[in-house]
Design a protein with these regions (language model features):
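Active-site beta-loop-alpha junctions enriched in small/polar residues
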Residues: 3-5, 37-39, 98-100, 142-146, ...
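Substrate-binding cleft of extracellular glycoside hydrolase catalytic domains
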Residues: 7-135
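Extracytoplasmic/secreted cell-surface and envelope-processing proteins
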Residues: 7-10, 42-45, 104-107, 148-152, ...
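Aromatic- and acid-rich polysaccharide-binding/catalytic face
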Residues: 152-182, 238-240
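Substrate-binding cleft of secreted/luminal carbohydrate-active enzymes
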Residues: 201-281
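Alpha-helical scaffolding within the catalytic cores
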Residues: 16-20, 76-79, 143-157, 183-195, ...
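Aromatic-lined carbohydrate-recognition surfaces of secreted/lumenal glycan-active proteins
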Residues: 93-98, 122-151, 200-214, 237
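Aromatic-lined glycan-binding groove of carbohydrate-active enzymes
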Residues: 157-162, 188, 192-202, 232-233, ...
Length: 281
């Protein structure tokens, strides 16, 4: 909750630790992605508090909570501007604001604002951060895995405000869930490949993963065949939660899919941080 001036994020990780880890990943030659699950400025609830209408309206210019929200953006800008390497250079970050907006579980989601209001929110965020010296961001647009390209692009703020096209897509662990996941991933990656060409933007799977990884060969038999066919920049799996033992998306030693993940890691067509040289040159 950086917008509140808290010292820890919603996963109870100190922001100073996050800052240090972002810099360390950059020094290793890797890329950091950052999302923002900010509180509901109208109710004081969390990002999932969608009981009250008009939250986005309230923070746009002229809204009752606009000044408060601008203060929140200021705190975010301070943190992003603090991401500097030992040589003084700012650390590049892939910033993924207002994500999964085609769903309605966040207060900035589809049912809670118009397409125009969403675009205004995105542009206001972008312009404020740019004006306040945050010049180390690449902006990622990441709706949910929409079956129709029209739904994907409906709230797109424009090529001048977006650097990468992504999407978030998750399966359930049963056979039906895996089949539906394959279908959804294929549908989105097919049209996203075309959109990337049309808009001259790289594409990515900005969130995915199988919770608790009960399918032992998920990495090589489910995920890899899906992403192998398309020109994606990266695929990101979600977090391993300290406070929820079964809420994890990357394996640990001895976990059912751990050996399969090693096979995935060693595949000649996958690249991890140690495989990438001179990303920033």
């Amino acid at each position: 909750h950086i917008e509140l001036g808290a010292d820890k994020n919603l996963d109870n990780i100190p922001f100073e630790r996050i800052r240090q880890d972002i810099i360390a990943q950059y020094l290793r030659g890797g890329l950091n992605t950052v999302s923002w699950h900010l509180n509901n400025p109208l109710t004081g609830g969390d990002a999932w508090d969608v009981k009250t209408a008009g939250v986005v309206t309230s923070i746009l210019p002229g809204g009752a909570k606009h000044d408060q929200f601008i203060g929140w953006l200021g705190k975010l800008a301070t943190f992003l501007n603090s991401l500097t390497a030992p040589d003084g250079k700012k650390v590049p970050v892939l910033f993924r604001p207002w994500h999964e907006h085609t769903g309605s579980w966040f207060w900035w989601g589809r049912s809670h604002c118009t397409p125009q209001q969403y675009k205004e929110l995105w542009k206001m965020t972008h312009d404020y951060l740019s004006k306040h010296g945050v010049n180390n961001l690449l902006y990622a647009y990441s709706p949910g895995g929409e079956d129709k390209v029209e739904d994907y692009i409906e709230r797109y703020p424009g090529d001048n405000y977006v650097d990468l096209l992504g999407f978030d897509c998750y399966p359930s662990a049963d056979v039906q869930g895996t089949d539906a996941y394959r279908k959804s991933m294929t549908t989105v990656l097919t049209y996203l490949t075309q959109l990337g060409k049309e808009h001259n933007k790289p594409i990515a799977v900005t969130e995915t993963g199988l919770e608790a990884l009960p399918i032992a060969d998920w990495w090589t038999e489910v995920l890899f065949p899906l992403v192998d066919k398309y020109p994606i920049s990266y695929v990101l799996v979600w977090r391993n939660a300290r406070e929820k033992p079964n809420h994890f998306y990357a394996p640990y030693p001895g976990q059912a899919s751990a050996q399969n993940f090693v096979e995935f890691y060693n595949h000649p067509k996958t690249k991890f941080c140690s495989d990438i040289k001179n990303l920033y040159k």
